[in-house]
Amino acid sequence: MSAEPSSSAQASAPTVVSVAPSKNGRTPGKAHKSAKTALRRSYISPSVKTPFEKRMEKEKAQQAAKQLEKELKEEKENERQRKVNIIKERRARKEEKQREEELRAKMSAKKLQRMKKREGRSKKING
């Protein structure tokens, strides 16, 4: 250590650096932070960038097309279900008719048998 500390202090006097006020006026420890701004993506070409309104119009058109497609699909499915129901009803009627026909045939066979039996009795008696 030398005997002239005051002269060296003057030569290397601390320089005062003004501290920039940070966000919300909080300076301690934040002087090195710069104010941040919203990100602007400059790497997207202008031909790709579209205004919000145009994008919304396009989205509405797509939604309308989807809605129309959905309605057409529902209509087609309803028509298919109607045809399936008609076929099922037709088959059920046919089966019911067949069952009634078999029942009639069975009943008429029994009736014929009874009539033959009566006829046979009368022949024996009359015969």
Swiss-Prot record:
GO terms for biological process: rRNA processing. Keywords: Coiled coil, Nucleus, Ribosome biogenesis, rRNA processing. Residues 52-114 form a coiled coil. It comes from the Eukaryota. Residues 29-39, 107-127 have a biased composition (Basic residues). Disulfide bonds: none annotated. Residues 51-105 have a biased composition (Basic and acidic residues). Residues 1-127 are annotated as: Disordered. It holds the Pfam family Cgr1. Residues 1-22 have a biased composition (Low complexity). Belongs to the CGR1 family. Involved in nucleolar integrity and required for processing of the pre-rRNA for the 60S ribosome subunit. This is rRNA-processing protein CGR1. It comes from Cryptococcus neoformans var. neoformans serotype D (strain JEC21 / ATCC MYA-565) (Filobasidiella neoformans). The gene is CGR1.
